[in-house]
């Protein structure tokens, strides 16, 4: 698979960096926008770091890559990519490895150009770009050698005078010493202002100050690269004179990296004498077993150091040696080791807010059975039910009975409550009564806790819309007019209207009028009312009576009809029921 996106971003970023003009702010803005995208295209989708031994899916068009060590782990993408779910299709990608190396070389090149100085001076994007440069720059590897420009990123930016200026001032000139006693070894300079260092620039440096008999050399060592040192005919013997074997339990000071108490651009500078004076307070304690992690920032382009052996010490020291116009001066910054006024933790601040309430305000009867004081946490949030408190010099306020009643008592009250139902009652009254019945507490109600109310779903209304279509149900809705069921061509079901004239049946057909076809009308009526008619006897027009034999379900009224010529409508109709 060809990582087209990462390749295109690398070409664009390289073109911008090579054509960078310090006087053009637009070019710096473009680099600031493009470089993070290039770094993101070379990120592992599992760990998020720069790719190491990258592998990529073979039969996929997505630009998702992972490290070889992260193969099989869950990716951080949401939603997940459907094209690269199967890790069996991932293979090593040589082009990605080349792009990662190109990214590192590009970052190394940036540290040696004026662009690095502009990145440090920029306030908005300094931290982000410096983090990218640290991630890609191989300055921390032992195989690479850094130049003076690269080291300027991690050392203090103070003017460095020449050797002639150092020796021109007699009061500040120190005693000379041979060049063979100078031993300066600095390894591992990184970019200043990175998030991992909080403004510091060296990964791990150590400065060791020995007893007076070995006070002629200083060894500054760490992991990284060697730095070129210049010959100087001055030493730090007067500075190291105040140190004695009684002050230090062993032969020196070990200074490592720390990353907390010093903010970027705000390092504290103290003289070496003040640092050594502060070390005298620690001379009575055993400092050989402590392993604290301070860091060192040193500019040793002009000035020798005394070589010492590195036993650990329990002080955090930040040393910066800058050459001044009047001589070599060693300055050090001591970060705060012990914070007297430390910040309170969240648990401590929360525990101070907890105040116990009197028992009498919580125990309201024998049913609760509480015998221990209950602590209530004070909060600013509004609660559903306020907690009853006892005023100063007063008595316990009464708590409403609804809060103290149990489930059974509430249910009993609801069951024994008089139920009034009237068909012509107002709907507003019915709704309030239904809601009151639906509210049933689920558990024993404790004071101070919100009551849980369970709402039941309203029962669906059965029957047709006749008389129920409006907000005010009425039995006179369909009287004298067509009902809504007739308009929808449906039969009425449990109709509450009086005089409803809907002629539709359940099967969707209309009823025939009784005077049209008597036999058909009776059959349709039987289907509508569900009557089993075994025999229907209708006498001729000449007969005086009509006898109808009906068997089936009891019917109070039955429709009987005769022909148009039959004028004996006032004669009796005999109906027999066989139950």
Swiss-Prot record:
- Looking at the record's lineage, which domain of life comes first? Eukaryota
Looking up InterPro entries in the UniProt record yields: MSL2, Msl2-CXC, Msl2_Znf-RING, Tesmin/TSO1-like_CXC, Znf_RING, Znf_RING/FYVE/PHD
Q: What is its EC number?
A: 2.3.2.27
Zinc finger region(s), RING-type:
44-85
Query: Residue ranges under compositional bias (Basic and acidic residues)?
Result: 431-440
Task: Please list the reactions this protein catalyses.
Answer: S-ubiquitinyl-[E2 ubiquitin-conjugating enzyme]-L-cysteine + [acceptor protein]-L-lysine = [E2 ubiquitin-conjugating enzyme]-L-cysteine + N(6)-ubiquitinyl-[acceptor protein]-L-lysine
Q: What does the record list as GO biological process? A: DNA damage response; epigenetic regulation of gene expression; positive regulation of DNA-templated transcription; protein monoubiquitination; protein ubiquitination
Residues recorded as binding Zn(2+) 1, renumbered to this chain, are: 44, 47, 67, 70
Pathway per its UniProt entry is: Protein modification; protein ubiquitination
Looking up Gene3D superfamilies in the UniProt record yields: Zinc/RING finger domain, C3HC4 (zinc finger)
Which residues does the annotation say bind Zn(2+) 3? 464, 466, 478, 483
Residues binding Zn(2+) 5, per UniProt: 478, 492, 497, 500
> What spans are recorded as compositionally biased (Polar residues)?
441-452
Q: Name one GO cellular component term.
A: MSL complex
What is the annotated quaternary arrangement, including any partners? Component of a multisubunit histone acetyltransferase complex (MSL).
UniProt family annotation:
Belongs to the MSL2 family.
The molecule here is called: E3 ubiquitin-protein ligase MSL2
Its gene is MSL2
């Amino acid at each position: 698979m060809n990582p087209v996106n990462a390749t295109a971003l690398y070409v664009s970023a390289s073109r911008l960096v090579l054509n960078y003009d310090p006087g053009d702010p637009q070019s710096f803005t473009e680099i600031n926008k493009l470089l993070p995208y290039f770094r993101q295209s070379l990120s592992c989708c599992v760990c998020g770091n720069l790719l190491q031994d990258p592998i990529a899916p073979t039969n996929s068009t997505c630009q998702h890559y992972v490290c070889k060590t992260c193969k099989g782990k869950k990716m951080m993408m949401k939603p997940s990519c459907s094209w690269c779910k199967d890790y069996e299709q991932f293979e090593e990608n040589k082009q990605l490895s080349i792009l990662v190396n190109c990214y590192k070389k590009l970052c190394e090149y940036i540290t040696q150009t004026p662009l690095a100085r502009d990145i440090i001076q920029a306030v908005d994007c300094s931290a982000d770009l410096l983090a990218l440069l640290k991630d890609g720059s191989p300055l921390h590897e032992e195989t690479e050698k850094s130049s003076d420009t690269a080291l300027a990123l991690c050392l203090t930016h103070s003017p460095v005078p020449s050797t002639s200026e150092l020796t021109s001032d007699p009061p500040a000139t120190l005693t000379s010493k041979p060049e063979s006693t100078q031993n300066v070894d600095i390894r591992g300079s990184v970019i200043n202002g990175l998030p991992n260092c909080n403004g510091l620039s060296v990964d791990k440096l150590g400065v060791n100050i020995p007893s007076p008999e070995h006070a002629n050399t200083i060894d500054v060592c760490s992991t990284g690269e060697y730095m070129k040192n210049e010959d100087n005919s001055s030493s730090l013997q007067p500075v190291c004179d105040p140190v004695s074997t009684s002050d230090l339990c062993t032969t020196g000071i070990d200074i490592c990296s720390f990353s907390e108490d010093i903010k970027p651009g705000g390092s504290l500078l103290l003289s070496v004498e003040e640092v050594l004076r502060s070390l005298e307070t620690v001379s009575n304690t055993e400092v050989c077993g402590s392993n604290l992690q301070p860091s060192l920032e040193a500019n040793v382009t002009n000035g020798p150091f005394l070589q010492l052996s590195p036993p650990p010490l329990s002080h955090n020291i930040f040393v910066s040696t800058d050459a001044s116009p009047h001589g070599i001066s060693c300055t050090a910054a001591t970060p705060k080791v012990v914070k007297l006024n430390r910040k309170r933790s969240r648990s401590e601040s929360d525990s101070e807010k907890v105040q116990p309430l009197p028992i009498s305000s919580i125990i309201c009867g024998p049913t609760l059975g509480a015998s221990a004081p209950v602590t209530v946490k004070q909060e600013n949030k509004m609660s559903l039910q306020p907690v009853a408190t006892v005023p100063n010099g007063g008595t316990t306020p009464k708590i409403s009975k609804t809060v103290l009643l149990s489930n059974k008592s509430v249910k009993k009250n609801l069951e024994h409550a008089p139920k009034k139902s009237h068909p012509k009652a107002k709907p507003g009254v019915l709704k309030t009564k239904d809601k009151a019945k639906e509210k049933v507490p689920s558990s024993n109600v404790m004071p101070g806790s919100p009551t849980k109310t369970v709402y039941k779903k309203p029962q669906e209304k059965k029957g047709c819309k006749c008389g129920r279509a409006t907000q005010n149900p009425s039995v006179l809705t369909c009287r004298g007019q067509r009902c809504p069921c007739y308009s929808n061509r449906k039969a009425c079901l449990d109709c509450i209207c009086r005089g409803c004239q809907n002629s539709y049946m359940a099967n969707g057909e209309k009823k025939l009028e009784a005077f049209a076809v008597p036999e058909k009308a009776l059959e349709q009526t039987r289907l509508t009312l569900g009557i089993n008619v075994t025999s229907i006897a209708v006498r001729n027009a000449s007969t005086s009576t009509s006898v109808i034999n009906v068997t089936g379900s009891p019917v109070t009224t039955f429709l009987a009809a005769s022909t148009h010529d039959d004028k004996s409508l006032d004669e009796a109709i005999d109906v027999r029921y066989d139950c």
